[in-house]
Amino acid sequence: MDTTMEADLGATGHRPRTELDDEDSYPQGGWDTVFLVALLLLGLPANGLMAWLAGSQARHGAGTRLALLLLSLALSDFLFLAAAAFQILEIRHGGHWPLGTAACRFYYFLWGVSYSSGLFLLAALSLDRCLLALCPHWYPGHRPVRLPLWVCAGVWVLATLFSVPWLVFPEAAVWWYDLVICLDFWDSEELSLRMLEVLGGFLPFLLLLVCHVLTQATACRTCHRQQQPAACRGFARVARTILSAYVVLRLPYQLAQLLYLAFLWDVYSGYLLWEALVYSDYLILLNSCLSPFLCLMASADLRTLLRSVLSSFAAALCEERPGSFTPTEPQTQLDSEGPTLPEPMAEAQSQMDPVAQPQVNPTLQPRSDPTAQPQLNPTAQPQSDPTAQPQLNLMAQPQSDSVAQPQADTNVQTPAPAASSVPSPCDEASPTPSSHPTPGALEDPATPPASEGESPSSTPPEAAPGAGPT
């Protein structure tokens, strides 16, 4: 605004704006910043959680009408609180706008879309409840099933179209010396656009107020005659809570808008009413912050869903703690390997039948030597190495059958039928002692074939899978 236009408007008693003429008289300060920051820190996560809960409920098909309403309302409140971040930035700079014209237009457009969508959505909800209360027999049968989806989509489209002027007219310009402010309308188009803003906001609010009063009066008159279903009572309780809070906290802003339009060209009254608009806008922010908590208090389904989500999250956190995890499987594998057994015996033992594993004597395993195992204790040899039991009995049949076979029958009862049921290792090793002229050479400890017969290298790879019963 140049000085010539300002002088002409000052001479006629009209001014383009009535907010501020001096940087020192800026009414908003530190307490406003603290209040707005507290609302943002409380309201943004709450509305985000409400949108996620309502989206999950609508995705699973539970309470679709209420879920779509709460999802749209939570998104509207979230955007309205996000637009307040620009207001905090402006307050911190003492009314100076440091972001330029593009950010100024985006700020007013975001504010207009979020404010109009919430207002139109609650007006449609109030009208729907009023028709349901006044025509309880006719309206439910004639209402389309997809009406909530159509209403929510139409509300967002209408709010976007209604906020298009805020993408065109706002501008960041020098107002007082080097003070740059973000103005929504200038003098030439302010009156017409202010009237559009007031009518576009006041008429839906008036429809909401009238329908809400009629619905509450009808509900009080018919509540003693008939009992509603639990789902209808829950939806009515949530809608009543939201609409009542909206009427109480947004009515001052609508009244301040009407008075501001009436005294638009009055300097002092316009300035006071501008301050009234600013602080009544804080009430709208408070309503957007409290709306998720009011919905949770009024809806039992949302409280149950929130408790289940929080309990699942707490259980996941407890599982991720280092002290709560005990690796049971690796400990079982370490115990089953047996540190005192040689490596080929451990492989053969892991492939045996679990029925024969508990019969191994753990006290005799550390003393068993693979090279001198037949001399230490021939009777305990089938227990320490069940895979080599058929070979010892076949190769040393003339000398050790009379001693080792009865003891193997009395001490070890289960491996005997297991060895007889798998004849493949015994049948393959049976021609070997018949080819040697001296079968007693196996009892000599200095002979290399005896040590090779018990050593890991003499065990064929194909004999390990057939060592135990399958």
Swiss-Prot record:
GO BP terms in the entry: G protein-coupled receptor signaling pathway
**What are the disulphide bonds in this sequence?**
104-182
Ranges in the topological domain labelled Extracellular: 1-33, 87-105, 170-194, 279-281
TM stretches of this protein: 34-54, 66-86, 106-126, 149-169, 195-215, 258-278, 282-302
Molecular function (GO) terms listed?
Answer: G protein-coupled receptor activity; identical protein binding
Q: Please report the record's description of how this protein sits within the membrane.
A: Multi-pass membrane protein
Gene3D superfamilies reported in the protein's UniProt record: Rhodopsin 7-helix transmembrane proteins (1.20.1070.10)
Q: Kindly report the protein's main subcellular placement as a broad class.
A: membrane
**What Pfam families does the annotation carry?**
7tm_1 (PF00001)
* Region of interest: Disordered: 1-25, 322-470
Q: Which residues lie on this side of the membrane: Cytoplasmic?
A: 55-65, 127-148, 216-257, 303-470
Q: Where is the sequence biased in composition, kind Polar residues?
A: 325-335, 348-414
Which subcellular locations apply to this protein? Cell membrane
Residue ranges under compositional bias (Low complexity)? 415-425
Say what the protein does: Orphan receptor.
Q: What is this protein called?
A: Probable G-protein coupled receptor 152
Please tell me the species this chain comes from.
Homo sapiens
Q: Which gene encodes it?
A: GPR152
